């Protein structure tokens, strides 16, 4: 990790600064996320799966910052998981890297939900039993923000759909 990345990690670890960043990026500057409603989460994402050869495969990734945000917005209360990735250099596949973090976080939510259902033996259908997830279960949204710290103008993709996809125009809207 570069010195710039380390300093940015320390800077945005502060809940007031983190809330400001999120409010500006996600809500156009409106004060929706409050510093006192942020809670630090483990930045390590670990996902295990059974490979084709029946051996366990484990993948571990470390986020720069990951927080739990309790939000009151449009009269309702929400919980959102927000990660920040500090980037000193242009990273031409950053949307895929961030998507990988997000998929791991969603996968862990599904795994924890399935574990709870197995313990409580409360899956109603064979489909729910197989997936470990019921029709009523909900995932907590995961958002990852990239903070670019470089001096060159960012010319990399900002979304997965602009990450060198080789899709025909008619398929582009489906990706």
Question: What is the role of each PLM region?
Answer:
Residues 1-169:
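Accessory alpha/beta interaction modules
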């Amino acid at each position: 990790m570069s010195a710039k990345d380390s300093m940015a990690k320390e800077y945005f670890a502060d809940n007031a600064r983190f809330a400001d960043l999120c409010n500006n990026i996600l809500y156009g500057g409106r004060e929706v996320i409050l510093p006192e409603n942020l809670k630090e989460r483990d930045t390590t994402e670990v996902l295990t799966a059974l490979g084709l050869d029946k051996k366990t495969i484990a993948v571990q990734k470390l986020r720069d910052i990951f927080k739990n945000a309790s939000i009151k917005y449009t009269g309702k209360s929400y919980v959102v998981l927000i990660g920040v990735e500090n980037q000193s250099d242009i990273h031409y596949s950053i949307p895929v890297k961030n998507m990988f973090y997000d998929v791991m976080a969603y996968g862990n939510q599904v795994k924890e939900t399935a574990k709870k259902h197995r313990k409580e033996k409360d899956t109603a259908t064979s489909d729910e039993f197989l997936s470990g997830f019921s029709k009523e279960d909900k995932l907590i949204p995961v958002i990852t923000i990239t903070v670019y710290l470089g001096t060159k103008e960012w010319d990399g993709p900002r979304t997965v759909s602009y990450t060198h996809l080789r899709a025909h125009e008619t398929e582009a809207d489906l990706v």
